[in-house]
Amino acid sequence: MLTSHSFPPLVIRGRSLLPIVQGGMGVGISAHRLAGSVAREGALGTIASIDLRHHHPDLLERCAQSPDRATLEQANLTALAREIHAAKALSEGRGMIAVNVMKAVSAQADYVRVACESGAHAIVMGAGLPLDLPDMTQGHDIALIPILSDSRGVALVLKKWMKKGRLPDAVVIEHPAHAGGHLGVTHLADMHDRRFDFVRVLEELETVFTSLGLKRDDVPLIVAGGINSHEAVRELLDAGANGVQLGTPFAVTEEGDAHPNFKRVLAEAAPEDIVEFVSVTGLPARAVKTPWLVRYLRQETKIREKVGALKHACPTALQCLSVCGWRDGIEKFGHFCIDTRLAAALRGDVANGLFFRGREALPFGSAIRSVHDLIELLLTGATRPSVAGRWAFFLG
């Protein structure tokens, strides 16, 4: 556990943490081993709630014997409870264990309920405006952390939640031009809009807080997307952020829950290997151009023209998304089974998987290092390697 660094702590619901947050990554990329290891260092580790049954052979066997929606959903809820308990045990009482729940997921309320009942310390929710999250967690002592991308979204959530007598315990501000996975914009062309620049959002939120009668320290602000160095952390905290969130750099650590092939694909990707596209959720997304994705994007226009408006049966029977371009026949959305592709990536199936990744270089280049090494590098600059051709992060 790192004890010597120069940054103030990130305080969330009375817990004093290192100002480092590990982002939630599904399917199964951030499960108990990664989240628990991050928390054991004194930071905030996050379990991605979606489809965790893939880490549990007995649950997969049960689903194979009864491949219906009810069985699959119950298996995933059981897996989530197991992962939370395992992460808390691994953390040895340090740090904080959060559960990430996507607003776009059909079973969001059940995931939130199980997270609360299983002793998670926080719920993190993105992929949509989590306006009803305080209602879903009524009666539970749990931190609530929405993920948003601009000051307008933060202001809306603050106003709605304040009417319910609740403030967010922190807010993650994710920059769509840098982050991996699903991005907080409506259209691909919007991701580089200046309204998402970290400094601008932090400055605008000073005004928002004042207008709502809030003090700046009432709600910690955590910035996310492209952060890959001690210098970037210092610059962002000096600019007014209370913490930083990273996803891809944690996914490729030794403790990351994915197959080694998954880590190699992310760690060895060059800038030209990373692509943005429209997911089946309708949201823009960022991933590595692996063989399946290259084929899909090459045929995307033809797929939309031929079957884009046709509804299809869910290939897994899980019905994981509340709105799905493939299942619901929404022509402008993506047209593939995202659960199948993400599960393939988790297993290390390079040919068939969908490998979400952030845009920027990784702190250790293509090297696979430990969670401790990553946090130490981010907070102190120690053990920083000399990586030829490493791309720099510039604060926007």
Which sequence ranges carry the predicted segments?
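Residue-level detector of alpha-helix initiation sites
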Residues: I29, I227-N228
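Active-site entrance/lid segments in N-terminal catalytic domains of soluble metabolic enzymes
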Residues: M1-K215, F393
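Conserved active-site-proximal phosphate/metal-binding subdomains
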Residues: V21, H178-F198, L202-D218, I222, ...
